[in-house]
Amino acid sequence: MSSNYVIHPIPLETIGGFAKPKMTYPFNWGQTVSMGVYVWYLEGPRENIIVDVGIAPERLLTRGYTVEPIQTLDEGLKKMGLGVGDIDFVIVTHSHHDHIASAHQFPKAKFIIQRAELEFVRDPHPIFKAIHPKDLLELIEGLHFEVVEGDTKIDEGIELLLTPGHTPGNQSVAVKTAQGTAIITGWCCIQEDFDPPPEIREAGLFLIPPGIHTDLMQAYESAVRVKNIADLVIPIHELELIHKATIP
């Protein structure tokens, strides 16, 4: 039986007017960018696995974002022939609200999270409390967590890579596909971060780190690691991926 996977982006909504330096630090001041919010279904030979669970647009609207809904979580999963009760595992890339706020909809699933990330979300630094609203902790405390530490192989086709910097326990998801290793970054980024314009490369940067970070140098090194390993990098908020049904 093949251990190759097919990755299905499930776009939930787009966010407009997002300050671009949050994605492309320290460049593009005064510019904004639109981004996608996704769940990722990893179609493979055995269990039903998704990466992240997204956030309902209503929660984003209360925080002042410009939001364009695409589909609900239920609608997106239904297109995959699934319901929330069919999901066996949720891989949590990191604990920011747009990646984990809908976790309570999956009562049967095991949530795979890095130990450093679980500790971070339970006791965030005051700087990050805006991204970890008080009720977020209440939403996730009843979840069934499977805690990992460091790089962890889930099966022959999926490996978790500890890629800290955006958050202390950010993890990227390396997926074996028919066209090589695809890596879902985990941290908040867009395609431009991995294909910076010539003037940025001339400044000596191989890529652009995220503007939201707990450790900037660590975030940069994690991004370099992913780019060097991956045959295909999947920037987790790249807007163009809303048009992709499958990867590769």
Positions of the model-derived regions?
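Metallo-beta-lactamase
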Residues: 59, 71, 76-82, 86, 115-162, 168-246, ...
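Beta-strand-turn-beta hairpins that frame and shape the catalytic cleft
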Residues: 2-7, 43-48, 152-160, 177-182
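Active-site metal-binding motif and surrounding structural segment of the metallo-beta-lactamase
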Residues: 68-113
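Hydrophobic/aromatic beta-strand patches that form the interior of the parallel beta-sheet core
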Residues: 8, 91, 112, 146, ...
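Divalent metal-coordination and catalytic microenvironments
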Residues: 7, 42, 52, 87, ...
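Conserved beta-strand hairpin/beta-sheet module of binuclear metal-dependent hydrolase folds
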Residues: 14-75, 79, 172-187
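Short, structured coil segments at secondary-structure junctions
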Residues: 3, 106-107, 229
